[in-house]
């Protein structure tokens, strides 16, 4: 007796195979909208203590989830050690390769620090482009570089995290930090007379 396959059974098998293929081809996103592939604190240059690394990873995680905006910090020894010549290119490639970002627009920001080259670069994607203007990035760099120059990378990264929170909040309120809307300098009570 010859066995025949019904068209309905063939259609169901084809659809099941298609669903499986799409599920395997799509990046693995967690329920919260982030790709769940890499740590947000990537200290390849090993400039942080284990405690600092853990503290910063927790801060990046908390901020990213609360703001629905991926915030990443990466250190490298040098561009040469990575076989690259451009901070911008390396930062953008790292962001893409690791599938960082929140949601379909991959909203986020990545700070890359090359220790040996004494350079830093901020890469933005999705809503990060709105929140981090060129003037805002320059201002943020001015806030971080004194600590980096002193070799206190943990302090510089804490500054980056705090300002990133402020930048995203200001942008969501319709006032991203830019040339005509820069953060106000803190009021000093040291000299009042």
Model-predicted segments: where are they?
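Bacterial N-terminal signal peptides
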Residues: 13-25
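N-terminal non-cleavable signal-anchor helices
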Residues: 6, 20-23, 48
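Hydrophobic H-region at the start of alpha-helical membrane spans
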Residues: 13, 190-193
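Folded, non-transmembrane soluble domains that reside on the lumenal/extracytoplasmic side of membranes
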Residues: 29-191
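Bacterial N-terminal signal peptides that target proteins for export
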Residues: 2-15
């Amino acid at each position: 007796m010859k066995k025949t396959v019904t068209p309905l059974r063939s259609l169901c098998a084809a659809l099941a195979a298609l669903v499986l293929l799409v599920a395997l081809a799509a990046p693995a996103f967690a329920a919260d909208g982030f790709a769940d592939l890499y740590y947000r604190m990537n200290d390849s240059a090993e400039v942080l203590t284990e405690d600092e690394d853990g503290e910063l990873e927790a801060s990046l995680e908390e901020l990213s989830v609360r703001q629905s905006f991926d915030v990443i910090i990466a250190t490298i020894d040098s561009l040469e050690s990575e076989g690259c010549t451009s901070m911008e290119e390396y930062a953008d490639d790292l962001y893409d390769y690791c599938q960082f970002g929140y949601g379909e627009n991959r909203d986020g920001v990545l700070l890359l620090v090359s220790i040996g080259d004494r350079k830093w670069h901020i890469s933005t994607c999705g809503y990060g482009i709105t929140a981090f203007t060129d003037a805002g990035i320059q201002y943020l760099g001015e806030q971080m570089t004194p600590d980096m120059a002193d070799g206190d990378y943990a302090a510089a990264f804490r500054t980056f995290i705090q300002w990133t929170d402020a930048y995203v909040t200001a942008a969501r309120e319709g006032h991203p930090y830019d040339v005509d809307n820069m953060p106000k300098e803190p009021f000093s009570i040291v000299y009042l007379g």
